[in-house]
């Protein structure tokens, strides 16, 4: 947010701030807090056009203020991700792998859970990842014992959604964890973002687990260490944004870039922005074409 739009946001219409808008990205919560929050450590590095940010929320007070859980959040951003070259793709994949590896226990099997509805493009990320995964749990029994230490047991499932199965995803995963006994669960899901420019350009990795659908106000039983009994690492990419956000971004561009607002009319602009965001568009969410 730039220029007048940033001032308008701070002045009133967007005062709900960190707890008043829905997002699955810890980075956006930090940004709305002014970039500095007591009890939160943030480090940022740049590599090959990719922005690598590591956020650690250490205090419960900070977690409550941001609406996040205490723990580690790794965010990778590449603004032209859908059109990046092969070299950048490899670098980004390596950074994602490194981030996941840094949060995983050193030993033990891993269960990968692809969340979402495979019939809805914006919600099919988790299921599509599982379809392309190399699972190895069943292979460990077929190879020589001396080689097993180099092959970690990985199993995967796409459990569907409550509306199709009638069963909470967390309930299905809890049963699987009891039987498979992994050392950790990796949950992959589509996320919701507050800023439209983050759609399909950002990857978030966290060791705090995930609450499916929370970004769009559809609260389900969470996949966390408390509910499953093992460490849960969540990996996600923002795939949806609120329609009101797109309207605000468009208005901000017109105001900031083309000077379509005369001085002295800021209060009227705030009212217009509020009407657009809260009245006409409400909780409608938007996703890119496939």
For each predicted feature, which ranges?
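Proline-aspartate-enriched helix->loop->beta-strand connector
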Residues: 177, 182-183
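An N-terminal, well-structured beta->alpha segment
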Residues: 60-105
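Gly/Ser/Thr-rich loops at beta-strand to alpha-helix junctions
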Residues: 115-123, 163, 190-194
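A structural-propensity feature for long, helix-poor, extended segments
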Residues: 147-176
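N-terminal amphipathic/basic leader segments beginning at the initiator methionine
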Residues: 4-70
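Short glycine-rich or small-residue beta-strand-to-loop segments that form or flank ligand, phosphate
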Residues: 77-79, 109-120, 156-160
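Glycine-rich phosphate/diphosphate-binding loop of Rossmann-like nucleotide-binding domains
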Residues: 117-152, 156
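A structural signal for small-residue-enriched, beta-sheet-centric alpha/beta enzyme cores
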Residues: 157-158, 187-290
